[in-house]
Regions:
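Extreme N-terminal leader/targeting segments of oxidoreductases
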Residues: 1-33, 51
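N-terminal Rossmann-like FAD-binding beta1-loop-alpha1 element of flavoenzymes
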Residues: 29-58
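Glycine-rich active-site loop/strand segments that organize a redox cofactor
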Residues: 72-102
Length: 172
């Protein structure tokens, strides 16, 4: 069985002070929105809704931004777990483009938020590399690259990668 992200301990989790809530729930207050789950999705949703003027109540059973969010490598990129070739095949080229546009906008929002609030989180822009180890994976990488381009995300095939491992084909 594959371990879920929340089962892993991230590099940064051991060095972060425990978050203790500063506010208690005001049971007499009427909230516009109740958000269940204090991972990156819940916290981001609360942040954006509050910026829009809504009163939000964020509920988390354990610790904010731990669990699945805490166990990730925190890489943010435009290449999703489900490749654009799959999105295109199951839905359409138009839907694949819409997903790519949404993902690019999400990356921009994250980057802008980091810079706006001067968040010291090691954020940097870098490239991602997909690689193929077998002939079957090479064929799949061709499809992924073409669909990624069709979706509006630039990528290209390269001959070398920054780690000393030989692969049959790479795409960046």
């Amino acid at each position: 069985m594959i371990k879920r992200d929340g089962c892993n301990i991230s590099l940064w989790q051991e060095s972060v002070d425990e978050y203790l809530p500063t506010n208690q729930i005001d049971f007499n207050k009427i909230y516009d929105v109740v958000i269940v789950g204090g991972g990156i999705t819940g916290v981001s949703t609360a942040y954006h809704l509050q910026k829009a003027g809504m009163n939000c109540l964020l509920l988390e059973a354990h610790e904010l931004c731990f669990g699945t969010t805490g166990g990730t490598t925190a890489h943010i990129n435009t290449l999703l777990d489900v490749p654009y070739s799959t999105i295109e095949k199951k839905f359409s080229k138009e839907k694949s483009k819409l997903v790519a546009e949404s993902v690019k906008e999400a990356v921009n929002i994250i980057r802008d938020t980091v810079y706006m609030y001067n968040i010291d989180c090691g954020f940097k822009t870098t490239t991602a590399t997909l690689f193929a180890e077998t002939d079957k994976q090479k064929d799949e990488l061709d499809k992924i690259s073409a669909a990624t381009t069709d979706a509006g995300i630039k990528n290209n095939f390269i001959n070398k990668i920054s780690i000393p491992i030989k692969f049959q084909k790479q795409c960046r």
